[in-house]
Design a protein with these regions (language model features):
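Conserved glycine(s) of the Walker
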Residues: 12
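Glycine-rich phosphate-binding loop used to anchor ATP phosphates in small-molecule kinases
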Residues: 53-97
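Hydrophobic anchor at the beta1->P-loop junction of P-loop NTPases
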Residues: 5
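The conserved Walker
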Residues: 9
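Conserved phosphate-donor/acceptor-positioning beta-strand/loop module used by diverse small-molecule
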Residues: 95-117
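Small-molecule kinase domains that catalyze NTP-dependent phosphoryl transfer to phosphate-bearing small molecules
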Residues: 122-165
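Walker A (P-loop) ATP-phosphate-binding motif of ABC ATPase nucleotide-binding domains
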Residues: 2
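Conserved substrate/cofactor phosphate-moiety recognition/catalytic segment
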Residues: 15-68
């Protein structure tokens, strides 16, 4: 199964994806980690073109992993999936792989997102160098509502509640 971790920066997508992968023997494929593996620091653009390229490599990797174990959960992380074409591309690949898919849209209050983003920036724990509250506001302004079937997860509620909600979705 391919699981898209959607939502604005700082909404808890990575934390939830990692927890779900640990509990299900799944695999998190992170766009930010792929980007840093593929490009030298001076080549990193944080552009839609480079993001789309990284996502394509992630989808090829997902296909390879699923060909070895079709029951595995693959969590696609590191992209807000703020544009419909991004989701449509993933769903087309899932269909071509004969894989079910789920969309988990993480949401939280703006204050929580701001706090998380500021903490990540201060601690240097996140791979994306452009990830800050300004990016949150920019992505929010252009975020296209997800019209595909999805489960909305309020990450202000705590990790256990979020995991339970997500597990209901992926097991359904």
């Amino acid at each position: 199964m391919i699981v898209l971790m959607a939502g604005l920066p700082g909404t808890g997508k990575t934390t939830l994806a990692r927890e779900l992968a640990a509990r299900t023997s799944g695999r998190v494929l992170s766009k930010d980690e792929f980007r840093h593996s593929l490009f030298a620091a001076e080549e990193i653009e944080y552009s839609s073109r480079q993001d789309d390229f990284c996502l394509q490599i992630m989808l090829e990797t997902a296909g390879y992993l699923l060909s070895r174990n079709s029951a595995r959960l693959i969590f696609l992380d590191g992209r807000p999936f703020s544009r419909r074409y991004q989701i449509e591309n993933v769903l087309a690949v899932a269909s071509s792989l004969h894989q079910p898919w789920r969309i988990l849209e993480c949401v939280c209050s703006e204050e929580t997102a701001r706090r998380r983003l500021e903490w990540d920036a201060a601690s240097g724990t996140h791979a994306a160098g452009n990830r800050n509250y300004q990016l949150y506001l920019e992505v929010k302004a252009r975020f296209e509502a997800i019209r595909s079937r999805k489960t909305v997860i309020d990450t202000d509620l705590g990790i256990e509640v979020c995991v339970q909600s997500a597990m209901k979705s992926v097991n359904h």
